[in-house]
């Protein structure tokens, strides 16, 4: 007997509400022109990785808990003597989320994690790259509910990049605003 999968809340919200609102606002001629979130890339760069090579694998475990997907340990592409980095040395971890996992992570990020960030005044609306992609940083990975605060030996930050199919930053900003991203005014 096949197990019935539950469609993520943000995904149904996108298809039932957001698409229609964007269609009306920007007057798209084709349904494929309506912007959507393509992928979310989460990266943890571990600065202390040069001293202890086990830290990137610990970060990858935490990132796997947060996202529900196995993280990849990132390695140095070339050696940099001033930073004591050798080629192939593990430096961090990253995950690329797509489809349902992406929408589930987006829901947890907007509703749970961002409100838990200390001294949070909203996301910078200027953090777009000019092509409709949005980048943000979080200083503590413990704001996510999947991380048990008592078992954490070190707190790491992370970069979160939301890639969209929007052609302009204004379209992407409206898309993310519709997903309840708390931008500063």
UniProtKB/Swiss-Prot annotation:
The protein's GO terms of the molecular function aspect are: rRNA binding; structural constituent of ribosome; tRNA binding
Disulphide connectivity of cysteines: none
Keywords linked to the UniProt accession: Ribonucleoprotein, Ribosomal protein, RNA-binding, rRNA-binding, tRNA-binding
rRNA-binding: present as a keyword of the record?
yes
Q: Name one GO cellular component term.
A: ribosome
Record GO biological process: translation
Q: Carries keyword Coiled coil?
A: no
Q: Which NCBIfam families match?
A: PRK00010.1
Q: PANTHER family recorded for this chain?
A: 60S RIBOSOMAL PROTEIN L11-RELATED (PTHR11994)
Subunit structure, briefly?
Answer: Part of the 50S ribosomal subunit; part of the 5S rRNA/L5/L18/L25 subcomplex. Contacts the 5S rRNA and the P site tRNA. Forms a bridge to the 30S subunit in the 70S ribosome.
Give the similarity note. Belongs to the universal ribosomal protein uL5 family.
Q: What is the purpose of this protein?
A: This is one of the proteins that bind and probably mediate the attachment of the 5S RNA into the large ribosomal subunit, where it forms part of the central protuberance. In the 70S ribosome it contacts protein S13 of the 30S subunit (bridge B1b), connecting the 2 subunits; this bridge is implicated in subunit movement. Contacts the P site tRNA; the 5S rRNA and some of its associated proteins might help stabilize positioning of ribosome-bound tRNAs.
* Name of this chain's protein: Large ribosomal subunit protein uL5
Species whose genome carries this gene: Bartonella tribocorum (strain CIP 105476 / IBS 506)
The primary gene name is rplE
